[in-house]
Amino acid sequence: MQNFTYWNPTKLIFGRGEVERLPEELKPYGKNVLLVYGGGSIKRSGLYDQVIEQLNKAGATVHELAGVEPNPRVSTVNKGVAICKEQNIDFLLAVGGGSVIDCTKAIAAGAKYDGDAWDIVTKKHQPKDALPFGTVLTLAATGSEMNSGSVITNWETKEKYGWGSPLVFPKFSILDPVNTFTVPKNHTIYGMVDMMSHVFEQYFHHVSNTPYQDRMCESLLRTVIETAPKLINDLENYELRETILYTGTIALNGMLSMGARGDWATHNIEHAVSAVYDIPHAGGLAILFPNWMRHTLSENPARMKQLAVRVFDVEEAGKTDEEIALEGIDKLSAFWTSLGAPNRLADYDINDEQLDTIADKAMANGTFGQFKSLNKEDVLSILKASL
């Protein structure tokens, strides 16, 4: 294992009806609150009214930033920052999925900075302070409710980058599976692809002696594989929603990567794709990940074989490690397709016209990837295989 320090200060509040804990959780942070949410689904589901009721009980003055995009824009972040400064906001409350939470993290840091929030995203400025914030989660997917990472898009420059700071861990996150009942089938599928992709990014490394980390990753993957087909046919099943909600959080709260840094190359490529074409993040991952795996297989066939055998139950007899690994990759792709996820860029009407532009954006900070360091030719090869 590699040396590591694990620290995660987010209080996780999980279960039915736990939004009623809001007044108590808000007490340490002040009463001037900015409520951040997306396109209005929380109003249709009734969650908005529940949250407002609890904020009123807390005696909070509520300001709102609505309309956070699925790939949150820095322009929206800057709107939130302006509200925070004009209204002397004490606390931010993100009610939504990962995009809303990611946007809120950037607002929290940007509110304590005099420049453009894009400076924080591009790491030109390292945050020295941030407003406190909490979350009420409505989508099992990103794990942003219990980590310090965020992904923000600049639509004007067609750039999309991940950033993070220990200052932007949520103070608390409230996870009620009931609040995910109204998530439509396609977004439920995307969420499960996303959390599996997070596990894969942490699974693919060359560090020796990580048996427990490996088994945690494999257990999470098998749990999603077992649960997903049931859930997409029973969207209001509490226990199935509960399982996936918890799994999504554990997939990216830092536990899986203790002692072994993961890869994250596929996410970097997908960020470049969705910066140009604004496609769903997890849809891009479903297309790219199997092709990244095929492209990098020769780096560590034993690792890919282990995944194929332990997670996808590939039979070993009479096959080479590479054949076993490739069968596992095919099973992954087939599984995602069976759920309804896309498997070609053509599914989003993406052709080869802008592949070079996408590759250049992926290479903005030079070669990347821990499992295999990718250059532009590698990226183009993966993109072409994904058409």
From Swiss-Prot:
Which keywords annotate this record? Answer: NAD, Oxidoreductase
Q: Which domain of life is it from?
A: Bacteria
Which Enzyme Commission number(s) are on file for it?
1.1.1.-
* Gene that specifies this protein: yugJ
Query: Could you give a GO molecular-function term held by this entry?
Result: alcohol dehydrogenase (NADP+) activity
Q: Which InterPro entries match?
A: ADH_Fe/GldA, ADH_Fe_C, ADH_Fe_CS, BDH-like
Q: Which GO cellular component does the record give, naming just one?
A: cytosol
GO biological processes: 1-butanol biosynthetic process
Instruction: State if Transmembrane is listed as a keyword.
Output: no
Oxidoreductase in keyword set: yes
Give the metabolic or biological pathway. Answer: Alcohol metabolism; butanol biosynthesis
Q: What is this protein called?
A: Probable NADH-dependent butanol dehydrogenase 1
UniProt lists the family membership as follows: Belongs to the iron-containing alcohol dehydrogenase family.
